Amino acid sequence: MLNLTSETISELCDVYGNAFYLLDSKKFNNNFVELSNEFKKIYPNFNIAYSYKTNYTPKLCKIVNDNGGYAEVVSEMELEIALRIGVEATKIIWNGPIKNQDKIKQLLLMGGTVNIDSVFEMVNNESKKITENENV
């Protein structure tokens, strides 16, 4: 855990300005592992899908991926971040109300998951066209 003093914060402000993120990646990692392990005691098939919308800082997203977590994305940018840091498509879940039809098709063909908000959503029509993947 970080030991912050007012002097340390002042030094950081001198370097980065008054607005910056300070992340404790070790603490984030430990919290992720602890949460996952506790749930797996009760639900052995439990997985965490980390919301990139909440904080898509690649370092944090990579920690989630390195610990077996899933990427929950809501935009093309978040999808690209997930793929760029090495998340397997099978561990990407596209959620949210706005979905690019071409990106959905790409993710489905790669083995990813798309949450469907209604039976009328465009994903339903697209998935019917994809015959190579029986899990759609």
What residues fall within each predicted segment?
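A charged N-terminal "starter" segment
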Residues: M1-T113, V119-N135
